[in-house]
Amino acid sequence: MSDSDGSKRPSETPDAADSDSKRQRGSSKSPVDVDEELNAILGANGISELEAASGNANQQDIMDIDFDNLPAELLQKDDIQADRNSVGRSTSGSQTPQPIKSESMINVPQSSQISRPIIRPAMPSAPVVPSSSAPVNRMNPLVQQANSIHGLNTSSIDNRTAPNFSTGHSTGQAGGNNQDRFHTNDPSKLNDALAAAGVDIGREEELLQQQQYNRAPRINVQQPSYLQSRPARQIQRTPFLNSYHLGTFMQRVARENGVLQSFMSDNELLELMSASCEQWISHIATKTVLLSRHRRRGIPALKNKKLAANQIPRSEVSKELRNLALKQKELEEQRVSRRILLGLENKDANSESNKVGAEETLHRAANETAAMMTSNKKKYSWMSSGAGNGDDSKAMEREKDKQSHLLALRGDNGLRFRDIRTGDSVTMKDLLAALEDERMGVNKAIMKGYARLKD
């Protein structure tokens, strides 16, 4: 066999026969030379026909011819590889895959020894089966979820397609079964993940509905009706001071200080001032009551803790006042004795003038004693039962012994303890003492209080 250039090709050798047998067994592991394949399949007549079809057999390479004219038996080989450029194959549909020439293959420099390209087949890809429906966003509650579970994201499962394990495309009943298999709009068919996890969709929906039903009555019970809450709100909103009078007073004070502002329309400010005044007055009243209690109740003495049943506890203030009265009594006795020495007083107690004065004094004392017996006012110690055993009776006897006959002629029956006439009431002194501890806004009030104070 001779080529187009006149060179003779060697006859087939045992190695060529072995390669032919391997090719027939379908081995695709070792690359195969294109020239050997052409020689083995076409023979001398086939090659000459290809050269004649190419039009330029002397200058054009055999592989530069149109690949469409090659026999289908050569193009269906799976063990063809390319040593320089990779060649792709088209696998769309059921058409016969054909090799594709690249520009680098065409621009191969002409030389005496040209390496033949070895073509490798591309992996067959499965045909893409278009989905019957558009993907549904199951996480969006506004999208209509037909025959599906609300809130369950199954978009990734909806987009799944059944793999085509056959070389051809799937038709007929097989495609319908695959679509029914991966269709997730029916909750009963989600058995791949939910059943394995042990989730019962129907039971979960019933529990959610039951929880929402149980929450509704509790919310209604906690919220009171308008008729029940209206009186309480009105009581809380009642201000301590009248809003009109408070706003008028604040506007007058602001005008005196050069501020032109109307406070009548600002209700929040009026409520704040009313609450502040209430707190300040409460503080002053509490402090006044405490001072009045301290004034009426002194520090208890450590001695004579056990008092008689009819004995009245005396305060330290009453005792001090009594001591001052005793000193004044002694000074008065000294003054009367000096008047007697000067002849200004009668020493004789049995004179007529002294008897008349003593009778008037006794008559006045008798009337006062009768009034005490008929009323609930303070009584003398001798008017109460068992008074002879008390300490007050002994004190009265000592007072009688100390009593001067000169003062007795004037109707002085001796000194007694001065109890507080105000009782448990709060006086102006207590209020002024409470205001004196304040720092601001009390100067005028203190001056007016001391001006009106009566001893």
From Swiss-Prot:
Residues 247-323 form the Histone-fold domain. It comes from the Eukaryota. Residues 1-12 have a biased composition (Basic and acidic residues). InterPro entries: TAF4_C. The keyword Ligase does not apply. Disulfide bonds: none annotated. Residues 1-37, 80-112 are annotated as: Disordered. Pfam families: TAF4. The keyword DNA damage does not apply. Residues 314-370 form a coiled coil. Keywords: Coiled coil, Nucleus, Transcription, Transcription regulation. Residues 83-112 have a biased composition (Polar residues). GO terms for cellular component: transcription factor TFIID complex. The 1.2 MDa TFIID complex is composed of TATA binding protein (TBP) and the 14 TBP-associated factors. Belongs to the TAF4 family. This is Transcription initiation factor TFIID subunit 4. It comes from Meyerozyma guilliermondii (strain ATCC 6260 / CBS 566 / DSM 6381 / JCM 1539 / NBRC 10279 / NRRL Y-324). The gene is TAF4.
